[in-house]
Amino acid sequence: MSGYDNDFVSKLEHSKEVVRDALNEYDKVAVACSFGKDSMAAIHVAREVDPEIPIFTILTPYKPVETFEYLVDMDKKMNINPIVYLVGKEVPPILKDNNINVKLLPTDKFETACKEAEKESGKPIYEYDPDKCCTLLKVDPTKEAVKDLDAWVCGLRNTEGRTRKDYKEVEKRGLVKINPILTWTEEEVLSYLKENEIDLHPWYSKVFPDGRRIRSLGCAPCTVPIYDNQEERDGRWQGTSKCGGECGIHTQRLK
């Protein structure tokens, strides 16, 4: 741990202890992964405690192609072996060709909502009703992913934005949620990934002419670059009432 200061060494050990306690208390536990920086840190911490802990991810038709490519790349490098939940009729070729385990979910509700959004506004659903879009493509699939779990682990952090300041390391509301890196800073996450030679999603390396960059990763239409003096999640859902907010996975009961 030569690359860490003493404060972070203590913080890291505490994060592992949070995961260890969860695994000792609950039988069925899995880690949720968005393949953003925080998820990758959470996965690595959890796998340090239990190398066999299951991983699941929720993909959407609007995720950038780089996310699919990054998933495949990191699966090979880290043996993540994720179960992918996706509202769709066909497994994306890149996932099929690389033997990624994909569970396709029905598309009828999403297709109906898309048609209604287009008819009522002339806009795609992610612009007209981002809450419904997130519910159908993220929240409902997450409910499917966790239905047999006793607890789930995620990379939520309380310094990401205004909506995450009051979360606890262990949340017990319907389904137990474990937030082992809750108190980590953005800088600590990036340092941890670098120290452990974990590649970042390529979108994080994009720097725009005005100095803005991607700091929180989501679906392509709903992710924009922001300045360093903004909160990390300010680049999510800009131009909508959800700006800097939540998709619903962390605010709605999942079970």
Where are these regions (language model features)?
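Nucleotide-activated chemistry modules centered on ATP-dependent adenylation/adenylyltransferase
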Residues: 1-255
